[in-house]
A protein has these predicted regions:
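C-terminal membrane-cytosol helix-exit motif in multi-pass small-molecule transporters
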Residues: 180-199, 395-399
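Cytoplasmic helix-loop-helix junction between adjacent transmembrane helices
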Residues: 109-151
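Hydrophobic core of transmembrane alpha-helices in multi-pass small-molecule transporters
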Residues: 22, 90, 102-120, 313-329
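Central cavity-lining transmembrane alpha-helices of secondary-active solute carriers
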Residues: 51-69, 258-271
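C-terminal ends and interior cores of transmembrane alpha-helices
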Residues: 85-100, 293-309
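Helix-loop boundary and gating motifs at the non-cytosolic
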Residues: 7-58, 217-260
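Conserved MFS/SLC helix-loop-helix module at the cytosolic interface between two early adjacent transmembrane helices
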Residues: 61-98
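Helix-to-loop junctions at the C-terminal end of transmembrane segments
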Residues: 63-76, 166, 267-285, 373
Length: 410
């Protein structure tokens, strides 16, 4: 406690925001695995299970757009605490008798969880902007990378946690236990999180939810295609391919993807070292262009390897590991740029608009993944992924660059 009290107010607030985000992320990952496993054992088809998460994604788009406005008007402490509270309610909605767990009821609980997740994420990412002085861009990059990377690593841990809780406590016991722990964290956050954090000095109007910043609009468009490129082959096509072509059972597929997400999160945390922060460099538009261009080569290489008759396991699994490393760097770099570009007064408006594009890209990728894989196979999903990444790279060419940077995008 003495060591904690010796820290600056900004660092203590950062640790509190990060702790809230970590706790939420663990329950988010665990809940996803709980729902998938439990309803799989009840005989739900893969399509029905996918439908359970449809509202989760759709409401993510809406929440990011409106949540930034709410954060600027109410303060980020309130939007973060609202997110934690909504997740507790979503968990308790699933603790009802089994007869109540109809498809619409579970979809409603998932919608609430989706709203909670994006309120929490938007609040956490926006808060960092206010806790780091504008002159310390290297520190800002490092803090954003740690927050983003640790979140994804813990989401993977959450997948394993969900499976373990289901085995130990059953479905109802698992959601009640998670709700109880998260409720305690929520109560602590209500008391300790700084009041009026992120509240705009000038009350924003509702029309301000649409960004007026050229840099943020460009970055948001690039982010849409970046995450669409991942999910167009990762969400549906990859798990189904691993199951049907490789013959992996559900536990092996789930365990592999959870491990991939943990590794992906670790690389995100290390992104500042990978992109040259230790040499005094922080990313700009040129870096976003270069890293997206490098990433675009991978899905194309995987598609060529699969079509050429090479070992599918070597090509796909090896390519997936490399894709995870490069995608983690791209994602962490983008996360830093949005926080850097966002204006300090009403920061959540800019961050919320940006993550709305992120959620829209995920939704687009998810829908295309199912349709393209069913109609044309995984090869087409990979080529579309490459196309999306090339679009993300070209769009990133228009982002601001440091004065010493130059890249010819023509």
């Amino acid at each position: 406690m003495n060591a904690l009290s010796a820290l600056s107010t900004e660092v203590r607030q950062y640790l509190l925001v990060t702790g809230n985000y970590w706790a939420f992320t663990l329950t988010d990952g665990a809940l996803r695995m709980l729902v998938v496993l439990h309803f799989h054992t009840l005989g739900y088809t893969p399509l029905q299970i996918a439908a359970l998460f449809l509202f989760y994604e759709i409401f993510g788009v809406i929440t990011n757009l409106v949540g930034g406005y709410l954060g600027a008007r109410l303060g980020l402490n309130r939007t973060m605490n609202i997110g934690l509270g909504l997740q507790v309610i979503a968990l308790l909605m699933l603790a009802v008798p089994a007869a109540w767990l109809t498809l619409p009821w579970v979809m409603g609980a998932q919608a609430l969880s989706g709203i909670a997740k994006d309120l929490n994420k938007m609040s956490a990412k926006s808060s960092i902007k206010l806790l780091v002085p504008g002159s310390q861009q290297g520190t800002l990059y490092r803090w954003v990378a740690i927050l983003t990377g640790s979140k994804n690593a813990l989401k993977g841990v959450g997948f394993f946690l969900g499976g373990a809780l289901l085995a130990l406590l059953g479905f109802k016991g698992a959601v009640v236990a998670m709700a109880a722990v998260l409720a305690l964290i929520w109560l602590g956050s209500l008391v300790m999180l700084k009041k009026d954090l992120g509240k705009a000095k000038a009350k924003p109007k509702f029309r301000d939810i649409l960004s007026k910043s050229r840099a943020i609009n460009i970055l948001s468009a690039a982010r849409l295609f970046l995450f669409g490129a991942r999910d167009v082959w990762f969400v549906v096509a990859l798990p189904v391919y691993l199951s049907t072509v490789f013959g992996w059972d559900f536990w092996l597929v789930g365990g592999f993807l959870a491990t991939w997400i943990i590794g992906y999160g670790i690389v995100q945390s290390l992104a500042p070292a990978i992109t040259g922060k230790q040499r005094g460099h922080v990313p700009d538009g040129r870096a976003a262009f270069v890293w997206a261009g490098l990433l675009a080569m991978l899905p194309a290489a995987i598609a060529v390897g699969l079509a050429g008759g090479w070992s599918a396991k070597v090509v796909l699994l090896g390519g997936l590991i490399l894709f995870g490393v490069l995608f983690a760097v791209n994602s962490s770099l983008h996360s830093y740029l949005i926080v850097s570009y966002a204006k300090e007064d009403g920061v959540s408006l800019d961050v919320g608009f940006y993550y709305m594009s992120n959620a829209l890209g995920r939704l687009l990728g998810t829908l295309l993944s199912g349709w393209l894989y069913q109609a044309y196979g995984i090869g087409t999903c990979l080529w579309v992924s490459m196309l999306f990444l090339l679009l993300a790279a070209v769009i990133a060419c228009a982002l601001p660059r440091h004065s010493a940077s130059h890249v010819n995008c023509t």
